[in-house]
Amino acid sequence: MIRILQMAVILLSVPMIVIAFYSHPSVDDYGYGSSVHLWIQEHGYHVFGIIKCAAEFAYEYYFKWASSYLDSFTGALMPENFGCYWISALMIYFLLTGGMLYLFQSMAVSLGGKEYRWIGTVCALTGIVAVTQNWPSSAEALYWFDGAQSYMGYHAVSLWMCSALVMYMFCGDKKRSIRLLVVSCVLVFLAGGGNNVTSFMDVLICCFFLGCAVLLKKKWGIVFPLIVSIAGFLLELLAPGTAVRGGGDYN
């Protein structure tokens, strides 16, 4: 069964990977990537300068238009600025499928033990086939960088976040629990910076795990990812750019 599903995923992935090499920038890609593009033309490929330029662009957009505190930053680093637009689709695809695989395996191992890892693998591969063959628009999901990274990219980060939270809830080693808690907080912050929907979902997910902690009467450290998720959501909700995009005034 696993081999059949593995072959199905590989065969179904080939066309999507090939198409990635024919994708090209469009619409918001130019708006978000223009500042870094101009900086590279003037100063060349200097890593810290490019990061600084992208951060300045994100800061400006946070107050003027886009409330997401990380989306504008990653959008400014459009791969076409570096001559490799095709890599964006591959990064998002493997980040998403890897997140699904890791999440289901984490659940299977945490609930049943390592001997049940294969169940998680089967569920993940089945889910990957279902998702990749049924999304409304593969162009927006993978091949349009700005839209894909804003939604699918940060959704994929949420999957990795859920994996870390699952492993934390079932981890019996204190030191490993602390490491998983730190990783969870980092991933919660990153996932929440993509868009309002993902940010709010992260709050709900952390609330669910807090409910599990209440039932189990342990793992109260889950409060820290919850606090981070709420802080991230408020960063987006209360951003000046939110009022601008929603029709408010900006002075």
Predicted regions, residues:
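Membrane-interface micro-motifs in multi-pass membrane enzymes
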Residues: 118-169, 195
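Start-transfer (signal-anchor) and selected internal transmembrane alpha helices
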Residues: 1-16, 117-120
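Membrane-embedded alpha-helical segments of multi-pass membrane proteins
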Residues: 70, 91-99, 148-161, 203-204
